[in-house]
Amino acid sequence: MNKGIERGLKELDIPYDTFFYQFNDWEKDDDFLEQFHAYLKAGNYTDVLSVNFSPLISILCEELGILYTAWVYDSPIHIRNTDSLKNSCNRIFFFDRGQAEGYCKNGVNAIHLPLAVDTDVFRINASKREKESYRTDVSLVGKLYQTEYTYFTAPLQGYTKGYLEGIVNAQGKIYGGYLIPELITDELLARMNKEYAGVATDGFKMGRRELEFMLACETTGRERYMALALLSGHYQVDLYSTDEDKRLKNVRYRGYADYYTQMPLIFSQSRINLNISLKTILTGIPLRVIDVLGCRGFVLSNYQEELMEYFNAGEELVVYENIEDLFYKAKYYLEHEDERKQVALAGFERVKRDFTFRERLQTMYGEHK
């Protein structure tokens, strides 16, 4: 997103400087606090903009009386202490409306803003041979979400273990709804921690947020595994990930993919690009979907409420309702090349027109500043 944001700021003639820092810990880094404090004081800045929310930036901006604008594309926000979300200097734009509404109810200045794509950034002049090396029927770029679910459930008694398995199975059958938080009760956590106390010597306790995230990742991981296993039995399937699952013997593992130099070729040369969202995304359109469309790629995605609001499903991208539906829709579009290309082109035209960084930045700095 960084290149797109910078190009958008230039288009709008908004002057800016960039500050790069590699965090060791997003929530505790004295070197960063010292360096960025001096940088802000020397530059006489009125606003700080970051991709995703940084507690340390918020703390500094609160102290110096500077507006802090964050654009979040992650769900959930990966911070342990959420107190800084309520700082008065913050304007936090969330790609996920459901997430924004939840934070708003808890006193956070949370605003819904879908993500964007700069189609020119992804334009690559690749040779025919280079393009051919990325050609495949189906591809997935992302994690397999191999969790420690088995490790953490192993010490639990049969009833508790079965209840957790029931949560994962129930969530796996629901598309367009997020059940996990409602099913994690105080009674469940108390029972789990009582059972852990009987075997753990380090005083370990499972927290609500940790359990919710683990179950969401486990559910997502199972869905991704099933999709890849099913499709790879019939078509060439490529996986771009640092993860590997030896059970997926028919999947071609391609390793890590660079965001700017490889992903545009992956998305444009894959006949079908899968989007299987992490279950913690309540309503929002993941960055992966918008990036694929911005590279003229064809998207086959799970249901997300905002996908249906911002796109014409079946015309600009395709949405599946369950794993069986995913297989049959993949089969259909792999057998109907002209329709597949037509959908991909329409999706590209949609994001090029309606998902620009210029428009999103105008929302940030026009209506809200």
Summary of predicted features, one role per range:
Residues Q35, I57, R80-N81, T261-Q262, ...:
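Short acidic active-site motifs
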Residues M1-G65, R209-F213, V237, F357-K369:
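N-terminal pre-catalytic "stem/leader" segment of glycosyltransferase-like enzymes
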Residues N52-F53, V72-P76, R97, L115-V117, ...:
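Histidine-centered beta-alpha loop that forms part of the nucleotide-sugar donor binding/catalytic region
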Residues E62-E63, S84-N87, K131-S133, S232:
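Short, conserved loop/helix-junction motifs that constitute active-site signature segments
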Residues M1, V108-I281, Q304-E305:
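Nucleotide-sugar donor-binding catalytic core of glycosyltransferases
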Residues P76-N90:
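Membrane-proximal helix-turn-helix segments that form the acceptor-binding/catalytic region
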Residues C61-P76, R91-F94, S139:
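Active-site proximal beta-strand in glycosyltransferases
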Residues M1-N24, K86, N90, R97, ...:
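Catalytic binding pocket for nucleotide-activated donors in carbohydrate/polymer assembly enzymes
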